[in-house]
Amino acid sequence: KEKKILSGHFSNTDGNVFAIITPRQVDRGALMSRYSRTDKSMRRIFLDEFLKNENRGEEFYDRVLLEYGDDSVAELGEAQIAIEGLSNIAVKKIEDRRIGLSYLEKSSRYVAWNKKENGRYRFYRDPEIKKSKFADMYEETCTFSFEVYSKNIEPMINYVREKYPIEKYSFKDSKDKKEKLFSKLKNEADIKSANMIYRGSTKAKALDILRGLLPASTLTNVGITGNGRAFEYLLTVLSSSELKEEQELASKIKKELETTIKSFVRRADDKYGKAFQKYLKDVKNKSRSITSKKIKSNPTKGAITKIVDYESEKNAIDKIITSIMYEQSPSTSYQNILQQVKKISKQEKIKIIQEFTKLRTNRRHRPSRAFENVYYTFDLCNNFGMFRDFHRHRALTLERQLLTTDHGYSIPNEIKILGIENDFKDAMNKTKDTFETIRKKYPEQSQYVVNFAYNYPYFMKFNLREACHLIELRTVPQGHVDYRRVAQQMFQQINKVHPVLSQIMKFVDMKEYDLERFESEKRTEEKRKKLK
């Protein structure tokens, strides 16, 4: 009888490894947490304590979290939520959270953002601006940006297809499995498949080129998976924001999380949560106050990718080799190993680094943690659209400023060639005028009107292991041309200051590509065929 009951809550009833499949997240987390405080098996705990009391999980968490403040147990329950129709300002604030949450956001590459709702383009209309004298100006500026974007989608797709005709590319012939030019394909299914690959990659290219026109108010969707502790912190951060949108999102997210992991997020708005919100506001205000007295504004125009902090390669190599040897060393301290490593000849040290470089046979073979001991800081100012891609990397320190029009914007060459440079500049100039007018009274809300093409200042500090992951990933052929170039510049600058250590980044692609998505679309189509 017990086995029958357990089968609905655990993947098996007698093995020593099993999945917890009981429906309620709060019970799953409470079972794991309770597990650490008894010598009973988890299935026994479930039968003895949870089966007869459907509120047992919540009661347990209320006691542990509220009475003892044991934060770590809030990591044992997870939830998945979807947020639709939030701005690109709010989604970046959410995605600033690095630990315990995973995100998947609507793409600006695969989806055109030209749809209207009730006759209006889909962008966020901030309530503070809506009730101000700037309401019409804001509406007109965002609408104009969308109009220029929307009316040029088809012309840009046509231009891309003219510049990169399908006849120029090779596709797989299903009969002999060889790559052949499009004109040489005979099989109807192969021709259809080739057209699908070509249409997908050319549309992606066109949308990549045009995305700079989109304002930060553009509405997007994001899915989030995370644990209770991380969600609680997210709610605290959003609640402390000066933006109404982010405050309202905090309330909506909390309401929905209460349907699945209520006990984990209860404290986000209690007296401790309110105190934490006040602390976050105080930190921001104190920083703003000190900065206004000590730092003079000095905005630079144009894009920047510059390494500004690093250590000597000699010291860096010693640290990495010490860490490589630490795990396998015979009961020897880090300090002692370091002293011994310093006595190894330079050539021997280079050879050691090269040995570990040889072991990597693809980019997913990450360097070991030893390579986390060396750091680089980059001063960056790139278009906001590109920043959104780099922002996804979280195993690093990233600080960023408010989005403004102070640093100029980038124009893709294709915009000029297609003959829409004037339209593009008109949109940028209109944005700048509106932004400058609104920012005096609403410095935070004025961000919404700024286009993705405008340059955005931030800095990133990361270790060599993360540099390897970030740069190799962001230089893959299918990447957006903007972030590929920045990642390539990062590699060149690291290579200049650390020519030996940078060898570990052996899968950096320094080439330029016509249709970035083409080869990737081909691989996807091959996989699709195998699934049929």
Model-derived features: positions:
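A conserved ligand/cofactor-binding region detector
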Residues: K1-K532
